[in-house]
């Protein structure tokens, strides 16, 4: 699944003000009463009004083909809110809507289309505010304070459904089979789509569609649905409804990357940084009971404790998984931070990455060739850099207009405070020594003879993650680094954006009139003592990259103000998020994996033990989406990521890649 810009919908508005696709010569909704048609066909056809109060689970999942203007989603959301108001004690608490759209509307067209339905304005405005960039892949939108989740998959539905992770199999309670009419858009209405719908449908799941075409009914029956006709809406004579009355066999396509969750809803998190904080929120939103154990006397004393950190995506033309992950992680992070109800120092001032030498210029040229939306990344010539950044550099580069900087320490502290208000229990100065399986959970042994037992455990303790017997073989490494804090000058005060070169320089923080220059890099080190050599090195890298500008030479590090931290990283620059893999069992079970892929069992893991680690230097970008991915996995909910990209986050990936090629694997 190559990551690329998505072509927006090519539409016009007819005399009635209804959007019409020029490419498909079809309306997006009925000229007569599109809202009532949606209520009749999709809500009524799936019997949702009757099913909501009787639903035995806290989450109801709806999937849709063709998001269009979002009319179906907004109508359902309105109905769900009305249900929750009428049945506050019902088991069902949250709505999850998954939709596929090949040609998403431009935001301006979306806003115009929504003017048709003033009664939906409270819901439409929330959707408009979070409308994502036109990037292929999954965009998760958290709406109504997380009670409603919208997964927008941009791209061709027949391609996307073949690339979904197995976590979506048998999760859908109701299908809205929508889109332009089969005669107008035959490429969508395929047997592959019908088969995918059946695979994703939960036993007892339903479907409804406006069409009564015979080939659609027969195709859905062949896929496994029991179909029937129903009176159509308005002038349409008939429509189709269906139910999945059987449990279909579901072979796992890549068992070595299989992910497992739990229905226990109780977990301990080991850590005290941004990963722990954001995962706590994500689990609490799903109704979990969460306890956090932090080795330090306060949060954010490790790698998450910096004053300023840059937020921008890590892009690579030669690594599709890296590009897909960080593009979507970045856009999710911006939406997430904007809606987070806590205060933290930040400025979405933009980030400009500069080509200071031939190698970096070539890298930037390759990134710019990837057909990315201008809202995400755009080229900037040397003569324009000073205009957008405020300082001269004599370098061209790439700018991320939605990037910027934020204070990780303040973010972490305030998110944990919010989580405590929502029920999080926190224990400080609890240094985990070891953990072992006990009955149906985990026994945690802390320094000072303290013990605790929990159903599930998540290790999110940064570079210390490999200190346990279960994790000692993980291929992660520590990186010590020092960030220099420098006072502003008249020239530095002009800096309007974060500059990235062979290091980074932030605009001044109004809270302290200082800039941050970072960071030194010592692979394999866990040293956190101040280093004057590192301080001078941070300054010298800035001068070496911009030798012709005077302001760089005026940077003053003599005050010896700095912060030292240790990051956890991997050689492929991607986080490790998911089940903790069992190294010894993996080598035994997969000894012949290269020759016997068809006989492979599910990946050997430690039951109910998870990890959220190796965020490297891009944790501010990756942590929000990673927290959402892991919380969804642990809760056995749909995961907002395609299978191949999700595999690239699997903690066992580096071992499995070698085993698939018949190569030897070494610990660490």
From Swiss-Prot:
Keywords, A to Z? Answer: Cytoplasm, FAD, Flavoprotein, Methyltransferase, Multifunctional enzyme, Oxidoreductase, S-adenosyl-L-methionine, Transferase, tRNA processing
Its recorded reaction(s) are:
5-aminomethyl-2-thiouridine(34) in tRNA + S-adenosyl-L-methionine = 5-methylaminomethyl-2-thiouridine(34) in tRNA + S-adenosyl-L-homocysteine + H(+)
Q: Matching InterPro entries, A to Z?
A: FAD-dep_OxRdtase, FAD/NAD-bd_sf, MnmC-like_methylTransf, SAM-dependent_MTases_sf, tRNA_MAMT_biosynth_bifunc_MnmC, tRNA_MNMC2, tRNA_S-uridine_synth_MnmC_C
Q: Which Pfam families match?
A: DAO (PF01266), Methyltransf_30 (PF05430)
Q: What is its main location?
A: cytoplasm
Molecular function, one GO term: oxidoreductase activity, acting on the CH-NH group of donors
UniProt region (FAD-dependent cmnm(5)s(2)U34 oxidoreductase), positions on chain: 270-668
The biological process GO terms on file are: methylation; tRNA wobble uridine modification
Identify one Gene Ontology CC term for this UniProt entry.
Answer: cytoplasm
* Cofactor(s) named in the record: FAD
**Enzyme Commission code(s) on record:** 2.1.1.61, 1.5.-.-
Region ranges (tRNA (mnm(5)s(2)U34)-methyltransferase): 1-245
- Localisation: Cytoplasm
Q: What does this protein do?
A: Catalyzes the last two steps in the biosynthesis of 5-methylaminomethyl-2-thiouridine (mnm(5)s(2)U) at the wobble position (U34) in tRNA. Catalyzes the FAD-dependent demodification of cmnm(5)s(2)U34 to nm(5)s(2)U34, followed by the transfer of a methyl group from S-adenosyl-L-methionine to nm(5)s(2)U34, to form mnm(5)s(2)U34.
User: Which family, according to the similarity comment?
Assistant: In the N-terminal section; belongs to the methyltransferase superfamily. tRNA (mnm(5)s(2)U34)-methyltransferase family.
**Name assigned to this protein:** tRNA 5-methylaminomethyl-2-thiouridine biosynthesis bifunctional protein MnmC
Per the UniProt record, the source organism is: Escherichia coli O6:K15:H31 (strain 536 / UPEC)
Organism lineage reads as:
Bacteria, Pseudomonadati, Pseudomonadota, Gammaproteobacteria, Enterobacterales
């Amino acid at each position: 699944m190559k990551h690329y810009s998505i072509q927006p919908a090519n539409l016009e508005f007819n005399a009635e003000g209804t959007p019409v696709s020029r490419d498909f010569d079809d309306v997006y909704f009925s000229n007569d009463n599109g809202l009532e048609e949606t209520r009749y066909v999709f809500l009524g056809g799936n019997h949702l009004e009757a099913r909501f109060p009787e639903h035995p689970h806290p989450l109801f999942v709806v999937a849709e083909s063709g998001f269009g203007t979002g009319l179906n989603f907004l109508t359902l959301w309105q109905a769900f809110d009305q249900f929750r108001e009428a049945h506050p004690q019902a088991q069902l608490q949250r709505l999850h809507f998954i939709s596929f759209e090949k040609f998403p509307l431009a935001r301006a067209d979306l806003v115009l289309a929504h003017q048709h339905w003033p009664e939906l304005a409270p819901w439409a405005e929330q959707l408009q505010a979070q409308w994502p960039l036109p990037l292929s892949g999954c965009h998760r939108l958290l709406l109504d304070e997380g009670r409603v989740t919208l997964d927008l998959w941009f791209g061709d539905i027949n391609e996307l459904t073949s690339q979904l992770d197995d976590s979506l199999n048998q999760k859908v309670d109701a299908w809205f089979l929508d889109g332009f009419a089969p005669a107008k858009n035959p490429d969508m209405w395929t047997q592959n789509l019908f088969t995918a719908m059946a695979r994703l449908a939960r036993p007892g799941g339903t479907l409804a569609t406006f069409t009564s075409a015979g080939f659609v009914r027969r195709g859905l029956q062949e896929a496994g649905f029991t179909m029937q006709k129903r009176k159509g809406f308005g002038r349409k004579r008939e429509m189709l409804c269906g139910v999945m009355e059987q449990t279909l066999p579901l072979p796992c396509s890549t068992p070595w990357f299989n992910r497992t969750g739990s229905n226990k809803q109780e977990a301990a998190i080991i850590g005290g940084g941004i990963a722990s904080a954001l995962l706590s929120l994500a689990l609490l939103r799903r109704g979990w009971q969460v306890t956090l154990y932090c080795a330090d006397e306060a949060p954010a004393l490790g790698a998450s404790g910096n004053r300023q950190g840059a937020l921008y995506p890590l892009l690579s033309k030669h690594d599709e998984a890296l590009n897909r992950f960080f593009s979507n992680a970045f856009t999710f992070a911006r939406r997430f931070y904007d809606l987070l109800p806590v205060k933290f120092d930040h400025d979405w001032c933009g980030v400009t990455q500069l080509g200071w030498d031939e190698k970096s210029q070539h890298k930037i040229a390759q990134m710019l060739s990837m057909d990315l939306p201008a809202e995400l990344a755009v080229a900037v010539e040397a003569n324009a850099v000073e205009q957008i950044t405020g300082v001269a550099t004599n370098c061209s580069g790439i700018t991320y207009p939605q990037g910027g900087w934020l204070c990780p320490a303040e973010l972490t502290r305030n998110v944990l405070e919010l989580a405590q208000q929502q029920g999080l229990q926190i224990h400080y100065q609890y240094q985990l020594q070891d953990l072992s399986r006990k009955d149906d959970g985990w026994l945690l042994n802390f320094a000072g003879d303290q013990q605790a037992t929990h159903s599930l455990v998540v290790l999110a303790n940064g570079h210390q993650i490999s200190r346990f017997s279960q994790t000692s073989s993980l291929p992660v490494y520590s990186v010590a680094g020092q960030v220099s804090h420098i006072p502003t000058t008249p020239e530095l005060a002009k800096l309007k954006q974060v500059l990235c070169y062979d290091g980074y320089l932030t605009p001044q923080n109004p809270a302290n009139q200082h800039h941050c220059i970072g960071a030194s890099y010592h692979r394999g080190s866990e040293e956190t003592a101040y280093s004057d050599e590192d301080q001078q090195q941070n300054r010298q890298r800035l001068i070496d990259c911009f030798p012709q500008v005077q302001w760089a030479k005026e940077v003053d590090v003599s005050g010896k103000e700095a912060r030292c931290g240790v990051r956890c990283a991997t050689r492929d620059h991607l986080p490790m998020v998911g089940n903790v893999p069992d190294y010894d069992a993996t080598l035994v079970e997969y000894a012949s994996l290269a020759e016997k892929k068809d006989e492979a069992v599910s990946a050997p893991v430690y039951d109910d033990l998870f990890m959220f680690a190796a965020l490297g230097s891009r944790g501010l970008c990756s942590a929000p989406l990673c927290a959402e991915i892991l919380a969804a996995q642990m809760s056995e909910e749909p995961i907002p990521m395609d299978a191949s990209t999700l595999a690239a986050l699997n903690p066992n990936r580096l071992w499995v890649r070698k085993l698939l090629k018949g190569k030897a694997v070494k610990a660490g």
